């Protein structure tokens, strides 16, 4: 009797987990279908080439234009810049915290990183708008500090907690025996960390980079507050608009074709994120198979 009861409970638990997993899949499918249904009509009316490669966005003009190439390039440049700044800093910090830092320093820094992860996006944007934007204007002697550079710096800071925490967890999970064997062969601790521990934790570090990319390309509020939110072609010291901020800034008052075009932008952003994640996962799996 007890065996049957345990089996029933086990089956019930498995059923609950299966349902929860299916709910997650269903949510993704619903979002995908909704974006496709809502975004395709505008692309059909505007024209795929004009929509993706048009350089002019004047959605509220008497004769509106709906070219999103500036938004696409700005999102690519902004994300790439944030990754180039944030990943090296986050990676080196994670190696230090996981392998080199004294316990007291580690505890303080880890708490600070956790606090950084919990700060709302609007606070990042507010601090960036009040401190970073004027600083860029003064240091580089430009008319307006609200620019692509300001957005890159803010995004780089925002992705640091994800990169540091995930990379650190992966490095701490490397078996101690690997490092002991390296040290026994005469390698220094630093050589061991970078030639043994880091390669062993590369899957987790790659996952941290994927999380960082997702956070950077999906951010809207903080970016909108420091980038100027003007639909220009991207330049480092010029006010720009990202894919996310284009949707966030106009959706509240949009209607008709303009509203449909914003859904099309959301669809492009969604596909863009899926493409990046798929590419990074493919490269990671190929690296595993070659290794």
Each model region followed by its residue ranges:
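Transmembrane alpha-helical segments of polytopic membrane transport and secretion proteins
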Residues: 1-21, 280-291
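C-terminal transmembrane helix and the adjacent membrane-cytosol boundary/short C-terminal tail
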Residues: 168-172, 176, 183, 252-291
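Interhelical loop and adjacent transmembrane-helix boundary motif
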Residues: 223-270
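Transmembrane alpha-helices
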Residues: 166-167, 189-224
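Cytoplasmic-entry segments and transmembrane alpha-helices of multi-pass inner-membrane transporters
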Residues: 14, 89-128, 291
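Transmembrane alpha-helix signature in integral membrane proteins
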Residues: 68-96
């Amino acid at each position: 009797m007890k065996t049957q009861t345990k089996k029933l409970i086990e089956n019930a638990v498995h059923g609950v987990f299966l349902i929860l997993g299916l709910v997650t899949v269903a949510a993704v499918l619903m979002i995908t279908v909704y974006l496709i249904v809502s975004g395709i009509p505008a692309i059909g009316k505007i024209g795929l080439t004009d929509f993706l490669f048009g350089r002019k966005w004047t959605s509220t003009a008497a004769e509106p234009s709906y070219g999103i190439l500036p938004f696409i390039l700005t999102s690519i440049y902004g994300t790439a810049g944030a990754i180039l700044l944030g990943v090296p800093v986050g990676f080196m910090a994670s190696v230090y915290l996981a392998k080199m830092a004294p316990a007291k320093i580690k505890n303080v820094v880890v708490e600070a990183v956790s606090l950084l992860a919990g700060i709302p996006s609007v606070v990042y944007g507010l601090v960036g708008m009040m401190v970073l934007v004027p600083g860029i204007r003064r240091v580089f002697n430009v008319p307006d500090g609200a620019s692509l550079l300001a957005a890159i710096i803010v995004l780089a800071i925002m992705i640091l907690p994800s990169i540091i925490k995930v990379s650190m967890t992966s490095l701490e999970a490397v078996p101690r025996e690997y490092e002991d064997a390296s040290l026994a062969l005469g390698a220094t601790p630093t050589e061991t960390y970078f030639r043994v521990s880091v390669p062993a934790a590369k899957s987790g570090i790659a996952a941290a980079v994927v999380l960082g990319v997702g956070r950077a390309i999906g951010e809207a509020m903080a970016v909108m507050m420091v980038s100027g939110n003007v639909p220009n072609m991207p330049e480092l010291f010029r006010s720009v608009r990202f894919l996310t901020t284009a949707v966030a800034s106009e959706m509240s008052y949009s209607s008709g074709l303009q509203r449909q075009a914003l859904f099309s932008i959301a669809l492009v952003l969604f596909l863009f994120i899926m493409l990046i994640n798929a590419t990074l996962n493919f490269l990671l799996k190929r690296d595993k198979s070659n290794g």
